[in-house]
């Protein structure tokens, strides 16, 4: 069967496919860092909200038990459980970025800290 001069095979040329792949690569190079940054920001915000909730629970615990400034730190696992909203598994909220929370003496600033603190951006600390 003879092909005419103007007849063309169906499909994409190599150049067209390379252009599409380059565009997809460029979009991925722009989008992926933004997704990573959004995830880190979301984790930091969740951690800060947990710190606020634990800080409020420490204040409630200290008021109810007449603890004065400088009193020993409250235990996250036993002392604060009645004063804090537990997560779905029935435990104290945890840092979503795998940090650990530590309580300090009553009235200190801050009363609760995350082990990640300023080591990550954005930071996991109470403003």
Task: Locate the predicted segments by residue.
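N-terminal leader/signal peptides at the extreme start of proteins
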Residues: 1-12
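Conserved Rossmann-like nucleotide-binding pocket used by diverse enzymes
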Residues: 8, 19, 31, 43, ...
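Catalytic phosphate/metal-binding cores of nucleic-acid and nucleotide-processing enzymes, i.e., regions
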Residues: 13, 17, 52, 56
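Alpha-helical hydrophobic helix detector
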Residues: 18-34
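Conserved catalytic core of two-component sensor histidine kinases
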Residues: 21, 48, 55
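Protein kinase-like catalytic domain
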Residues: 31, 39, 59-62
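Aliphatic-rich helix starts adjacent to a transmembrane/signal segment
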Residues: 36-51
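Extracellular/periplasmic head regions of type IV pilus-like filament subunits
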Residues: 56-127
